[in-house]
Curated annotation (Swiss-Prot):
The modification Pyruvic acid (Ser) is found at S71. The keyword Secreted does not apply. Catalyzes the decarboxylation of S-adenosylmethionine to S-adenosylmethioninamine (dcAdoMet), the propylamine donor required for the synthesis of the polyamines spermine and spermidine from the diamine putrescine. It catalyses: S-adenosyl-L-methionine + H(+) = S-adenosyl 3-(methylsulfanyl)propylamine + CO2. The active site is at S71 (schiff-base intermediate with substrate), H76 (proton acceptor), C91 (proton donor). It comes from Pyrobaculum islandicum (strain DSM 4184 / JCM 9189 / GEO3). PANTHER family: S-ADENOSYLMETHIONINE DECARBOXYLASE PROENZYME. The keyword ATP-binding does not apply. The lineage of its organism: Archaea, Thermoproteota, Thermoprotei, Thermoproteales, Thermoproteaceae. This is S-adenosylmethionine decarboxylase proenzyme. Keywords: Autocatalytic cleavage, Decarboxylase, Lyase, Polyamine biosynthesis, Pyruvate, S-adenosyl-L-methionine, Schiff base, Spermidine biosynthesis, Zymogen. Binds 1 pyruvoyl group covalently per subunit. One of its GO terms (molecular function) is adenosylmethionine decarboxylase activity. GO terms for cellular component: cytosol. Its EC number is 4.1.1.50.
Length: 125
């Protein structure tokens, strides 16, 4: 049931956001973004399964993602606009997606952040 009615049987928390005014250099730095996403996984208390990345052209943006046992973390960048989007979705009470999101934000140093939270849990009557 939506809105937290009944007992929660599956815990799912999704924090995601838009980051404006980031340094374009970091948004192009694949190695740095991979390091950031690996550290964010630890901070979220999630179990890292796989990390991947894709560069869109020689000077284009990047998609960097971590598949974790509890779901995923992703960073998508548009360096030409100083813009990035971040998703941290985890399942389980033991994880802290907000801490991971906040860590990524601290490393990308945006001038403005729009953050959103989604309860992706399942509730049973």
């Amino acid at each position: 049931m939506a809105g937290g009615v009944g007992a929660r049987v599956v815990v799912g928390r999704h924090i995601y956001g838009n980051l404006y005014g980031c340094d374009p250099q970091i948004l192009r730095d694949e190695s740095a973004l991979i390091t950031i996403i690996k550290e964010a996984t630890k901070i979220a208390n999630a179990m890292l399964l796989s990390v991947g990345s894709y560069r869109f052209g020689p000077n284009g943006g990047l998609t960097v993602f971590a598949i974790v046992a509890e779901s995923h973390i992703s960073i998508h960048t548009w360096p030409e606009y100083g813009f990035a989007t971040v998703d941290v979705y985890t399942c389980g009470d033991h994880t802290d997606p907000k801490a991971a999101f906040d860590y990524i934000v601290s490393k990308l140093k945006p001038q403005k952040v729009e953050a959103f939270f989604g309860d992706r849990s399942m509730y049973k009557e």
